[in-house]
Amino acid sequence: MRLHEALRRDRYRGHVRILLVSTYELGHQPLHVASPAGALARAGHQVRCLDLSVEPFDVEAVRWADAVACSVPMHTACRLALAACTQIRSLDPHIPLCLYGLYARLAVAAATEPTVDLAVAGEYEPRLLRWVDELEGRSPGTLAREGNRRPGESHLSGESDDRPRAVVELGRGRFGLPARHLLPPLDRYARLATSEELLLAGYVEASHGCAHRCRHCPVPVVYDGRTRLVEIDAVLADVAQLVEMGARHVTFGDPDFLSGPHHALRVVSAMHDTFGDLTFDVTAKVEHVLEQRDLWSRFAAAGCLFVVSAFESTNDAILGHLAKGHTAAQEVEAVTLLRSAGIEPRPSFLPFTPWTTAQDVFDLLDLVAACDLVGDVDPVQYSIRLLVPPGSLLLSSGALDGLLGPYDADHLSWTWRSADPRLDLLAQKLGHLAERADAESWSATQAYEAVRTAAVHALGRITPKRPPKSKPWLSSSIPQDERPHLTEAWFCCAEPTEAQLGATSLLPARARADGTSLADATARAADRSLADGTPLADRVSLADRVSHTSPLGVPIP
């Protein structure tokens, strides 16, 4: 019997009916719902999952549940989850409600009013399981009769809960098989786009946390330089069920896949030995790309197509403020090293910070052109502004002294303005431009040229008007508009898009203006590609990519 069929036949009749909610996981089928769902089900509880990025808000599921837990692994998900919690509370003011994931503690710290009963950051599964176990035997009616309980008060005996509502758990544990059968199938999520086809893609993690303390990153706020490894057999078991579901590519979503390089190599080797045709991508710091230079040829041979790496800036002073641990020159070195191994670099950027100048914007655009990265940068990367959430290591570094405005609770960040007001306007313009680029299916080259033109017009640069030519030793062998990438163009550290923030009604998820789904649009794109030879990656528009990850059905405050 196939693995997922066996899981589906296990009905998990349990003691507490728990609804797990995801709002956004970068277009992937949400691991941070599937994994705790498996743990809770194995403990005997009844579990349902709801992914608001591809499904409508399900009122009946909330009414069915004895308790609800929302996953908040990143900024975008946190903002949307808080809105979902408001809607859940409006349906049932007394339902036990939990937030879990990297942003959970931040969400509680940012709230002006108590919204949840428990927030668990870090290695959340054991604590989440204990919380649900404590609810065992308490029916929804019993909980409601406890009357006018404020969030944070005990469900068990009516007295105030002395434990903190926000906790960080960093204990080591073992992970079981995620209950992916409780979620929509992979064809509802982001895919791998190549020059010829769109392939189903899965998402796994081989480690949590990170050994570094980049000051703008939310990971060290929780993990404080620690890494927790996921057992290789657990990773492979999850990959196996993803392959059985149709995945032909896997994203390793670890904050830094090379925080434990020996573990990473063992995972990759074991996966390749078992699934020889499977391709994958990873995320790695620039300094790790260079330190582990001997790994890349082995990764390439095992199927690594591209590496996401946080370049952030070309200004070494800004990189110092962020404690990135690399220089602009090392970014170029990383590009050379990866390409020599046959792997595409896909840099992420943080173009707009309180320290950014107009020259920095052009330096970044010049780097992209000179390193032949135009086809490797999603347009939204040119528009991202620094977020400064509560607890950010930047707040205690002194780098932001005198630069911050008031705290914005709606956006979960301290505010700031550029010394050059033109930069704030440009960031906003580039955000709108990025959405338009996707909506109209611009090629990577078209998007880059539009971004550069907008920067010239906004900042007044006259010469040179044209970007520098790429250096032969830095160039890719793959045409710019045919490079492998995932069809989700957004990013974890960015504000929600206009499309996401505008998705406030209870419309069916994934509905497009013409009434078609992503799967329908993809099928039509494939047909057109076969007919006229246009690369399939160019046939999937923002309306397709954004709509299949926009959290429809959740009102945003």
Where are these regions (language model features)?
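Radical SAM [4Fe-4S] cluster-binding motif and immediate context
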Residues: 184-344
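A structural motif corresponding to the C-terminal lobe/cap of the Radical SAM core domain
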Residues: 261, 272-454
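Hydrophobic positions in alpha-helices of CheY-like receiver
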Residues: 40, 84-92, 267, 271, ...
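Cofactor-binding loop segments of dinucleotide-utilizing enzymes, especially the Rossmann-like FAD-
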Residues: 23, 52, 102, 255, ...
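Radical SAM enzyme core and accessory elements
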Residues: 1-21, 41-42, 46-49, 61-70, ...
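Acidic, low-complexity intrinsically disordered segments
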Residues: 2-236, 240, 244
